């Protein structure tokens, strides 16, 4: 489990093609400080398992074909910047919300509206996740726990989030251009509520 509070921006330093998979090498000195083989690290909101911890704060992780296709990890190349977070420790503060590290879909940044102190980012989303997104609710965008500040009024095919300076500075979303594909994970509580309501008839 993760919290959506990004610990650092890492950098992809290598990508090796495997059979139906890829092995990524990522530099992240903070998240690798106490990491070992088998630990979980969220990369752009995708839970990956550490294969090896390398010198200079690097680690390797394998990404299967389904994940490469369903998330933006398939677009990563050496030099790409990524959001990194270690799995939450029992008893640690839950600064964001419960994040599983299982991407539900990808969205696309369609507009950025900066102001003096914050910036509103509009993201187009597929219908498969739209029903779980509510105004003032939580959503994970590339591993970042954010609050939905606006929704499309009619078709509900987009939502907006507001970025404070700290989020812009410490995450990749601060520099992501219009047209960038981002990973989306909706609040898992909404999924459970829907399942319970369906079961109740």
Swiss-Prot record:
Keywords: Repeat, Riboflavin biosynthesis, Transferase. GO terms for molecular function: riboflavin synthase activity. 2,4-dihydroxypteridine 1 binds at residues 4-6, 145-147, 162-167. Gene3D superfamilies: 2.40.30.20. It catalyses: 2 6,7-dimethyl-8-(1-D-ribityl)lumazine + H(+) = 5-amino-6-(D-ribitylamino)uracil + riboflavin. Pfam families: Lum_binding. InterPro entries: ATP_synth_asu-like_sf, Lumazine-bd, Lumazine-bd_dom, Riboflavin_synthase-like_b-brl. GO terms for biological process: riboflavin biosynthetic process. Lumazine-binding repeats lie at residues 1-97, 98-197. 2,4-dihydroxypteridine 2 binds at residues 47-49, 62-67, 101-103, 136. Its EC number is 2.5.1.9. Pathway: Cofactor biosynthesis; riboflavin biosynthesis; riboflavin from 2-hydroxy-3-oxobutyl phosphate and 5-amino-6-(D-ribitylamino)uracil: step 2/2. Homotrimer. NCBIfam families: PRK09289.1 (NF006767), PRK13020.1 (NF009566), ribE (TIGR00187). Catalyzes the dismutation of two molecules of 6,7-dimethyl-8-ribityllumazine, resulting in the formation of riboflavin and 5-amino-6-(D-ribitylamino)uracil. This is Riboflavin synthase. It comes from Mycobacterium bovis (strain ATCC BAA-935 / AF2122/97).
């Amino acid at each position: 489990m993760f919290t959506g509070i990004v610990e650092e921006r890492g950098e992809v330093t290598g990508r090796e093609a495997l059979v139906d998979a890829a092995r990524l090498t990522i530099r992240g000195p903070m998240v690798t400080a106490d990491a070992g083989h088998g630990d979980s690290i969220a990369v752009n909101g995708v839970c990956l398992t550490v294969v090896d911890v390398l010198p200079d704060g690097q680690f390797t992780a394998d990404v299967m074909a389904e994940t490469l296709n369903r998330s933006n990890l398939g677009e990563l190349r050496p030099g790409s910047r990524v959001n990194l977070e270690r799995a939450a420790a029992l008893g640690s503060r839950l600064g964001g919300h419960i994040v599983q590290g299982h991407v539900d879909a990808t969205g696309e940044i369609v507009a950025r509206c900066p102001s003096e102190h914050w910036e509103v980012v509009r993201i187009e989303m597929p219908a498969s996740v739209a029903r779980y997104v509510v105004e003032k609710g939580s959503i994970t965008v590339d591993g970042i726990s954010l609050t939905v500040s606006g929704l499309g009024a009619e078709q509900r095919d987009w939502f907006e989030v507001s970025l404070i300076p700290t989020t812009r500075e410490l995450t990749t979303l601060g520099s992501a251009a219009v047209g960038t594909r981002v990973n989306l994970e909706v609040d898992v509580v909404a999924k459970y509520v829907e399942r319970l309501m369906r079961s109740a008839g």
